[in-house]
Amino acid sequence: KRQVYGITKTPIDKANEQTKKEAYQAVFADASGFNQQEYDADAADKMVADAGYDDTIDDVEQAIDKDGNALGYVITVTAKDGSQGSITFSVGIKNDGTVNGYSITDISETPGLGMKAEEEDFYSQFENKTVDKFTVVKQKPASDDQIEAITGSTITSKAMANGCNAAIYYFCLLYTSDAADDLIGV
């Protein structure tokens, strides 16, 4: 058993790293690189929880252009309130607070329902929006902060919106709060 684990661990780790890199690039297509940011995961999770989100902040990367200028951040979140368990995804947020979108790295929702969170009809609703938070609605959205739920999968829709909201909240703390130094480990 241990020998099989040793043989498969390195390829699995490499595949996971590649999946992350692809997710980062998907939410920051104009970035030429990403710098991992040190942050206090426990402090970040507590602040997000204190704001009412049952999500965790798993990683923070700074997106940079070819000259090394900061474009924004990629914040990887695990939403724990999906209908079939946790959903892990990366959210790209520009320096001005505009959400570029999200890219899912781990999901096991119901095929034909919750899995539609990976489809453009749903995820495109989050792209290029500057909002304080997203709200899920069952009808056509009337404003930028509204996301039309996936038919038959309101739980997954809300999990995705809440995860994006947790990332937005954390991003705002990085820029607008005295707590920023604690959050990023400065």
Feature annotation, model-predicted:
Residues A23-D50:
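Short extracytoplasmic
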